[in-house]
Amino acid sequence: MKKKLPLGNSFVERNQIWAAGEIAQANDILQAMDADDIEVVRFVFADQHGLTRGKTILKSAVAATLVNGCTITSTLILKDTSHRTVLPIWQAGAGLGTQRLAGAADLIMVADPSTFKRLPWAQGTGWILCDLYYPDGEPVGYSTRSVLRGALDKLNTRGLDLVSGLEIEFHLFRPIEKSLSAHDCTQPGTPLLASPLQRGYQYLTEIRYDELEPIFAEIRRALLKLELPLRSEELEFGPSQLEITFGPEAGMATADTAILARSAIKQVSRRLGYHATFMCRPHIPNTFASGWHLHQSLVDLKTGKNQMLPDNGDEALSELGQGYLSGLLKHAAAACLL
């Protein structure tokens, strides 16, 4: 007998968060957990810095968590990159002019059933990406997926959708063994001591790629088992600098791919005894800055036709494409903070 979600008077039902498609996908998750011997599911969300945070839920509680969400403290969206809460949560308005985040109030993670995966490197472990809601069912405006969804909804009202392709550069280091002491447990903690895996500055050379192929292979297998649209793996310019690229995806899918891919690469690398970092420029001599590239186009929502292509050969972009590019240039300085 197939298991069914306990939807009656649940959080997602009361607040009409899921449509029929999401309900069907969530029911499929319950069946997949039995078929794949999944023992736990990591319910996570992406914070303002792209870090995944959340809770690991045992199989017996997954069905209830899917429909009622999982509570977390609101301070998790108010932290800097050292994991310090940077806003005065014990003051009226919590520094943001809203009592909803004051006093470290609860937020609720609600899973997006379409994002469910089985983590190939962690035995019996599922993974699902969540959106954030207030206890009254209103979406949290500071939630990264809510921000993107709002922008995509505006685009869709114009009959358009975003198609984007992602390239990510990162460094892979070998940690230098050092006994962890209480003096390292500061906030932020002392930085990891690490050494490069190769000399670098031999961009796209096959021999240098082959030196890292055993590591690339494990990363590649993990990403493909996660059904991510991996397209290429490359040796970048600097020492121990790598790059991966993905095929184009529509809407929010590219952002979800970026979150899962980065987390997967870090976890797989750590289990192999290496340290992967996506920071722009590690404070290690002779390292070369990493970046990421987002290839973008606007397409017709119904036909999928690229609306940024010009009607004739006199222009590089259509009028819509030129306007879109102008907006990117106008907001480029602010976007650098991302």
What do these predicted ranges mean?
Residues E243-A253, A261, K266, R270-L338:
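Loop-rich catalytic cores of soluble enzymes, especially ATP-dependent carboxylate-amine ligases
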Residues M1-S232, T254:
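ATP/Mg2+-dependent ligation/transfer catalytic cores
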Residues Q48, G238, I284:
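Positions that flank functional sites
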Residues R158-E167, P229-E234, G273-R281, A335-L338:
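Flexible, glycine/charged-enriched surface loops at secondary-structure junctions
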Residues I168, E236-I244:
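Short, conserved phosphate-binding/catalytic loop or strand-edge motifs used
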